[in-house]
Amino acid sequence: MTEGEGRIQLEPSWKARVGDWLLRPQMQELSAFLRQRKAAGARVFPPGPQIFAAFDATPFEQVKVVILGQDPYHGEGQAHGLCFSVLPGVPVPPSLLNIYKEIQDDLGIARPDHGYLMPWARQGVLLLNAVLTVEQGRAGAHQNKGWEGFTDHVVDTLNREREGLVFLLWGSYAQSKGKVIDQARHRVLKAPHPSPLSAHRGFLGCRHFSKTNDHLRRRGLSPIDWSLPPRSALDTTSTGA
């Protein structure tokens, strides 16, 4: 998909279901676009080996919950392939601070000292951005270049081949992308985006985290532990950092 493509391998369970999409002409055009931007000196985030990190962290059969984001953070060292997440040591972005505030109000879990959400992903929370790359300082720079078709296909495949998932759709963009989800097969929870611009309009107070766990328990599944270990106890071996 990118310069260094040989080092990027889609996780096997995902490759079996959505890997063919990466061979389509529009994805080859996206690959060419990424190479051109890098050749022009653009800083593309996240680093190549982390572009598909959400799939590596949460294999297809292990998905319980899907959180849809828009595109990666565009600051130096922020994006590492999981939506809303940043690597340990990077300041927690404002939207994630509001997510933590809601978790604390909903479940009584104290805010962690970092923004690294890999422990959620390893429990079955697919942290998926609609667009998987961005350029430094240019939010949305890679929108409408081909990623959306691929991630639409991912959502549609989960919708058709899995049952009983929880989709957390925050903001109009995620809700539009989630229109294909069959609400007779899956639990869909909607709220405004956790951005400081909109969180007060209904994200804060949505109680999506307890509602997610209630649904999982009803299906006989283990709930998500939304608490995060302190930064000093994190396992960062799979970040590529």
Curated annotation (Swiss-Prot):
Subcellular location as annotated? Cytoplasm
Q: What is its main location?
A: cytoplasm
Keywords, in A-Z order: Cytoplasm, DNA damage, DNA repair, Hydrolase
> What GO cellular component term, any one, is given?
cytoplasm
Protein name, entry field:
Uracil-DNA glycosylase
Gene3D superfamilies registered for this protein in UniProt: Uracil-DNA glycosylase-like domain
Taxonomic lineage: Bacteria, Pseudomonadati, Pseudomonadota, Gammaproteobacteria, Lysobacterales
Report the source organism: Xanthomonas euvesicatoria pv. vesicatoria (strain 85-10)
Q: Which domain of life is it from?
A: Bacteria
An individual GO BP term: base-excision repair, AP site formation via deaminated base removal
Q: How far does the signal peptide extend, from start to end residue?
A: none
The family database entries (InterPro entries) matched by this protein are listed as: UDG_fam1, Ura-DNA_Glyclase_AS, Uracil-DNA_glycosylase-like, Uracil-DNA_glycosylase-like_sf
